[in-house]
Structures are given as structure tokens and as C-alpha cells.
Amino acid sequence: MIQSRERFRNVSGRNQLVGKIEEVTISGLLAKVVLVIGDQKITSIITADAAREMQLRKGQTAAALMKSTEVMIVRV
């Protein structure tokens, strides 16, 4: 995890979770990306353009970068 933090040192999102992409679903203007980190999953909704630009694919390693002001909590 320390190595991954070094990789993204120049971005403002200090909370970084590195995992494997389990799913990328593009629908219209948005894309859903599911990242597996250990035995947990995190789902992010990003623009379809961003998903295409980053060429996100199932099985790739990716990092979820979170800013404390941009985290949403949902009751489950």
C-alpha cells in the first residue's frame, strides 16, 4: 500500500485503495466500476469518457482515490 501511495503522491486524494477491477459497465454517459480490495468491493460511478480514456478493463489493477469532501455513505 505504501508503494501505491507514492505512485499517486501528486494528487489531492490522500485516501487510496488499490485493487483489481471486477466489472466495468458503461451505460450512456456514465460507467460503473467495481474494484475488489481484499475481501471487500468498492463501486464507483465515473463518466463513460473517463473509463474509456483510462482503458479500464476487468482484471486490471486500479486505485480508488478518495477525498474526504467527496465520499458518499449509503445505508445498506
Protein language model regions, located:
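Glycine-centered tight beta-turn/hairpin loop motif at sheet-sheet or coil-to-beta transitions
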Residues: 37-39
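Glycine/charge-rich catalytic "coupling/switch" loops of P-loop NTPases
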Residues: 1-24, 28-32, 41, 48-76
